[in-house]
């Protein structure tokens, strides 16, 4: 049986736009986990805090479930898919209304050994 060299963590239906999440995820993809955490700590963005939590969860999964060493881990995959959209309405002039789409995201981070 092949040895497992990667671990994954997912946050589902997170109340942040997938597009804004992807902008942050593009910065950490391919980096070591120490560099990725440092980048996320200094990114002034709601998505960065959520992604940092997912990354820490993936690191913990790698260490506890598969016995991987934190120093050897890199972010091999990081992506955000569209979750369910919360549909709301904003009242407008003359009794009309405009739709507002509050988007959600499914954020996935995969860490693997170098």
Swiss-Prot record:
The keyword Chaperone does not apply. One of its GO terms (molecular function) is rRNA binding. It comes from the Bacteria. InterPro entries: Ribosomal_uL22, Ribosomal_uL22_bac/chlpt-type, Ribosomal_uL22_bac/org-type, Ribosomal_uL22_CS, Ribosomal_uL22_sf. Pfam families: Ribosomal_L22 (PF00237). One of its GO terms (biological process) is translation. Belongs to the universal ribosomal protein uL22 family. Part of the 50S ribosomal subunit. PANTHER family: CHLOROPLAST 50S RIBOSOMAL PROTEIN L22-RELATED, LARGE RIBOSOMAL SUBUNIT PROTEIN UL22M. This is Large ribosomal subunit protein uL22. The gene is rplV.
């Amino acid at each position: 049986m092949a040895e497992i060299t990667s671990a994954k963590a997912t946050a589902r239906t997170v109340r942040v736009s997938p597009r804004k999440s992807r902008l942050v995820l593009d910065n950490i993809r391919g980096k070591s986990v120490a560099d990725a955490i440092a980048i996320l700590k200094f990114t002034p963005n709601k998505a960065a805090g959520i992604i940092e939590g997912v990354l820490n969860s993936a690191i913990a999964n790698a260490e506890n479930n598969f016995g991987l060493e934190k120093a050897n881990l890199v972010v091999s995959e990081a992506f955000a898919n569209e979750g369910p959209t919360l549909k709301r309405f904003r009242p407008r002039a003359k009794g009309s209304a405009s739709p507002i789409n509050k988007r959600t995201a499914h954020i996935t981070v995969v860490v693997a050994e170098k």
